[in-house]
Amino acid sequence: MDLPGPIHDFLLVFLGLGFIMGGLGVVLLTNPIFSAFSLGLVLVCTSLFYTPSNSHFVAAAQLLIYVGAINVLIIFAVMFMNGSEYYSDFHLWTVGDGVTSLVCTSIFVSLITTIPDTSWYGIVWTTRSNQIIEQDLINNSQQIGIHLSTDFFLPFELISIILLVALIGAISMARQY
C-alpha cells in the first residue's frame, strides 16, 4: 500500500503510541484481565505495522494466530486463576522485585540512549530475496518463507521472545499458587 508521506507518518506514530500504551498497560495494570487485553492491543498494533509494507498475509497471520489464539488462551487462563490468592500479598515488595525493577530500568535507559545514536541508514538490507522473487520460480508459500527469513526476521524473532517471556511468567505464576 503506497501511502502519502504524512499519512504514513501519522499511522506509524499512532501505532507507536498504541505499542507504548499497550505495553505500559501490560506492565502497570494490576488486574490480569486488563493486562491481557493490553497485550492484545500490542499484538494488534504489531499486525497493523505490516500493512504499510504490503505484507497483508503476514498481518493477517499475525492477527489470527497471536490475537485470535494466543491472547484468547491467555485470557481464559487468567480467568481460571483464583483472583483472591493473586491479590493477597500484592502490596509487598521483596528484594527480587527491587532487583528486577533495577535491571529493567537499566535496560530501558540503555535502549533509550542507544537507539537515537544508531545510524539506521548505514544498515545494508539484503536484496537477495527480491532477486529470487522477481524470477517467478517459486510459489507464494516459498515467497512468504523467504520474506520471514530475510525482510521480517527481526519482528518475527522479537514476537517469539515476547511470547517466551510471557510463557516463563505464566509458569512462574502457576508454580506460586
UniProtKB/Swiss-Prot annotation:
The chain crosses the membrane at residues 10-30, 32-52, 61-81, 92-112, 152-172. Keywords: Chloroplast, Membrane, NAD, NADP, Plastid, Plastoquinone, Quinone, Thylakoid, Translocase, Transmembrane, Transmembrane helix, Transport. It comes from the Eukaryota. Pfam families: Oxidored_q3. One of its GO terms (molecular function) is quinone binding. GO terms for cellular component: chloroplast thylakoid membrane. Its EC number is 7.1.1.-. It is an enzyme of class 7 (translocase). It is a multi-pass membrane protein. It catalyses: a plastoquinone + NADH + (n+1) H(+)(in) = a plastoquinol + NAD(+) + n H(+)(out); a plastoquinone + NADPH + (n+1) H(+)(in) = a plastoquinol + NADP(+) + n H(+)(out). The keyword Electron transport does not apply. It is found in: Plastid, Chloroplast thylakoid membrane. PANTHER family: NAD(P)H-QUINONE OXIDOREDUCTASE SUBUNIT 6, CHLOROPLASTIC (PTHR48479:SF1). NDH is composed of at least 16 different subunits, 5 of which are encoded in the nucleus. NDH shuttles electrons from NAD(P)H:plastoquinone, via FMN and iron-sulfur (Fe-S) centers, to quinones in the photosynthetic chain and possibly in a chloroplast respiratory chain. The immediate electron acceptor for the enzyme in this species is believed to be plastoquinone. Couples the redox reaction to proton translocation, and thus conserves the redox energy in a proton gradient. Belongs to the complex I subunit 6 family. This is NAD(P)H-quinone oxidoreductase subunit 6, chloroplastic.
